[in-house]
Regions:
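Divalent metal-binding acidic/histidine catalytic loops
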Residues: 1-279
């Protein structure tokens, strides 16, 4: 999209019925492109997709901008590196361990497929890593936040996600926890599927988040949260820690790879972060 453009502030004329149909068709084409690997347009597409019911001329122009970008940069390759990431275990040693969390979440246990449905392990075990982020109150009209996360198997990007949150959150802390819960749900499903395919998994999924409060509340049993719908996300993440599904650690915002899926960044920052897993 054009630099500085905010789709929610666009007040250009609304499209007619034919224009709406055309807009929806173009969105569908771009979604297909994202599904097969054009992750560099995911954030912009996510923002514009929310206006499919009543798009404006300005929204259509931005769709054309995206197609122009794809024409000028027709190739983007994702790295699929089978080697394990070089992650220092000491990053995940702060806070309470899994056994301590078990004191509160006694029934926490990772769901595993039935033994008769699991084939013999194939190949060597893999590790899974996730980066999660949220752009708090990113929408200038509704003040809804935006969730973004990515999941890796070893060093291979396997899942990418960018979507506006369903609720309006009063704090960055709440929006980040809701993003973390969404990420945990995808992690749980991925781990189940890998086992169904006969792929052994090395320990818990390592999750990186750039919000220190979220990391502290995910790794220290003594923390509490009372806001109802936020506390659901809060306990879901902590339950996953107790079940051994995830381990959570802090990462500097500058190196949070999920940052590109929550908001529009400068060209330099985009290129640096995308350069970690694309070429």
């Amino acid at each position: 999209m054009a630099q500085g453009y905010q789709p929610e502030l666009d007040m250009s004329p609304e499209l007619d019925e034919n224009g709406i149909t055309s807009f929806q068709e173009l969105i569908g084409i771009l979604r297909w492109a994202v599904e097969i690997g054009r992750v560099d347009i995911l954030t912009e597409l996510s923002m514009l997709s929310t206006y499919q019911a009543c798009p404006r001329q300005g929204h259509m122009e931005q769709i054309h901008h995206i197609f122009s970008y794809l024409k000028n940069k027709p190739k983007l390759t994702l790295y699929f590196d089978p080697s394990e990431p070089n992650i220092d275990p000491i990053w995940f040693q702060s806070g309470d361990n899994q056994d301590t969390f078990k004191e509160q979440y006694r029934e926490a246990k990772e769901e595993l497929p039935p033994d008769h449905m699991v084939p013999e392990p194939l190949g060597r075990p893999v590790s899974t890593t996730a980066y999660v982020d949220a752009s708090h109150a990113a929408n200038k009209v509704t003040r809804r936040s935006h969730t973004g996360f990515i999941l890796f198997i070893n060093k291979s990007l396997i899942i990418w996600y960018s979507k506006r949150q369903n609720t309006v959150e009063a704090s960055t802390f709440s929006s980040e926890f809701i993003a973390a819960k969404c990420c945990v749900e995808h992690i749980t499903a991925l781990r189940f599927k890998l086992r169904m395919f006969g792929v052994p998994i090395i320990e818990s999924t390592k999750v990186f988040c750039d919000n220190q409060s979220v990391v502290n509340n995910s790794t220290k049993l003594s923390s509490t949260l009372n806001k109802k719908h936020s506390s659901i996300a809060y306990h879901a993440v902590r339950w996953a820690v107790a079940a051994g599904i995830i381990k959570v650690a802090w990462i500097d915002t500058a190196w949070n790879l999920a940052d590109v899926f929550t908001k529009r960044l400068t060209v330099e920052t985009r290129n640096r972060l995308f350069g970690e897993w694309t070429y």
